[in-house]
Each structure stands twice: as C-alpha cells, then as structure tokens.
Amino acid sequence: MPTSNVPLDAAFWIWGCVLAVFLGFAIYPILTLGPYIRAGCRINIHRNRIPPDNKVRQPNPNGDAFVLFLSGVGRVSALTMSRREQGILHRLAELCSDAVLLDDVFAYSINNLPLVSHRRLSPMWRWALRQKLKKRLHNSALGYLINLRNILHILISADSRYAMVYNRGCAHVITDHLQQYGYDLAQPKPLVIVSYSGAGQIAAGAVQHLSDEYRLPVYVLMLACFFTASGIDRASHVWEFIGTTDQAYRFCLLFSPSRWLIPRLSLWRRLTAAGRTTRIDMGAMKHTGRGGYLDRNSVTPEGVPFIDATAQAMADVINRIRIDTESPKEA
C-alpha cells in the first residue's frame, strides 16, 4: 500500500515549540502550588543555616531591627550570592551595626528549597549555574534558564489567580526564618525587607500576610524593583531607589499598571498621596553590571563608588526607621 509522507516544514516546528512553551507556562503554577495546597498551605520549610559572614547572619538578642535582603533573579539558593550583593551586605552590616542582617532566604521558592539540591531537576540547575558562571557568551546564555525560572515565580506572585496562596507561603518562609534568629512574633521589632530587582514582587506579595496575619511592622526598601502595587499598601512605608539610567526598571514598569500615577484610582497613587512612598534618586546608575547600583569601580561626581553610595542611602533609611520606632518607647 502506498504511503504518503507529509513534509514538516520550519513553521510546524516553530508553532510546535510555541505551543509547548505556552502549555508549560499554563501548568507551571499548578505544579508549583499543588503540593502546597494539598498540604493545607502548611509544608515543611527547608532550613539550611549558614554560618555568619562578618556581621551578616549574626544573631543579636539586643538587635533593635531585623533587615532581610532578598536577592535578584539570578540566585539558585541561599548560598549563591554574587560578589556585588555580598559587598553591599557587608557594607550595610557595618553601617547598621545594631540591626540583625539576614540574607539566607531563597525568595523564589515557596518552601525555601534551593534549586541545586533536594530536587529531581537539581542536576540540571547545577549545570545551568556552571554555564552561567563561564565567560563564554553561548555558555552564559544557557545559564539564564535560572533567570527565566525565577521570573516565572515572580509572575505567579503577581497573578491574582495564584498570588494569595503563593505569597502566603513566602510569608511563612520569612517568619520561620526570622524566628531562627530570635525574632519574637509576640513582641515584633521593625522588619525591613531590602529587595533587589525581581525580588521586589516577592516582598510586595509577602507584605500583606506579614502585616495582616502576623501583625508585623514591615518597611520595604526597593532597589530598582519590579512589583505590582497589590499588597504593598500593608507596608508601613516603601522606599524606591532608582537610577536615572536604569532602562530595565522603566521597561518593566510598563507592565505594572497598578503603579502608574495617571489613573485616578491607582493604588500606588493613593499611597504616594498619603506620603507612604518615597523615591530616592540614585543618580546616573544602571540596573546591573558596570555602572550599576552595586558597581565598586564606577564613582559618583563626589568620587564615591556606586556600591558605597547605594549602601549609605539604604543605611540612612534603615537607621532612621530604628530611631523613629525607638522614640515612642523612650518617651
């Protein structure tokens, strides 16, 4: 019997790949949240205590504030901080010596589980991390699979269909982590969440539950962050640190209409009008890399390295929060 072979041209494979990607994006939130929902929104939180690094992750029973740093989308675990991020953390620890500074929360996991261990796909993520750390262009491009995966979690946090469940899980991770360092939920101290880039959405989503469910006084510092306004209104105050040459921030802002100041009913506009948001101009700083907020080689017109200027601006806000929250007690 004669058979006919139907030729499969390039369009077939292109549309097939597009459909596969679309279906993958559609079911990914369900795969991510399914185990969490089946467990009654209470699952085992992965704990991996990391030894103190200088004054970072150093328990302090007399600390008058807790500062939690959430990293950008390139992170795969609580252990993989970039040198630039480590640099600003050490500077903040020196400038805010009376605060407990923490950085070992993996913001892109609903149970704090790192990508590179205790997962079925851990070998793939370890391979992707190795590729990302290589200097050759084609290798590092493959490593950006990590960024894509973490961006999907940012989108889940911002999606109203999944946000309530996902963000509540992130809030549980944060409170569990704080208690490991002596934070008393019954007598809460100021919690300052410092977010970089995409982690801003994770922080914004968790704020609602940290405030409503745990009654914590939460302050948020956004370093060139992408986030929606939903939930952030529960924060006591929000500071945005933005450079004039940060085009990545401005591009992503286009996809967050809840933060546009033009609509009359914009939540972000109402928060701004109420004096609960502050924008701090960081000068001619870019989003990342050379000339970025954490660059130690580029300097301000006054001759201060960008990373030092960023750390000082953040430390000024953190120390102001500490002083303002102590004043009523002393009175």
Model features per residue range: what roles?
Residues 1-65:
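Intrinsically disordered, low-complexity regulatory segments
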Residues 17-20, 27, 33-47, 68-187, ...:
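Active-site catalytic motif of lipid deacylating hydrolases and related acyltransferases
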Residues 63-65, 99, 187-190, 216, ...:
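Short coil/turn segments at beta-strand junctions that form active-site/ligand-binding loops
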Residues 194-199, 203:
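Gly/Ala-rich beta-loop-alpha elbow adjacent to hydrolase catalytic centers
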Residues 208-216, 232-241:
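Short, surface-exposed basic-aromatic patches at helix termini and helix-loop junctions that form
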Residues 221-228, 243-247:
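Active-site nucleophile loop of the alpha/beta-hydrolase fold
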Residues 234-329:
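Lipolytic serine-hydrolase domain surface
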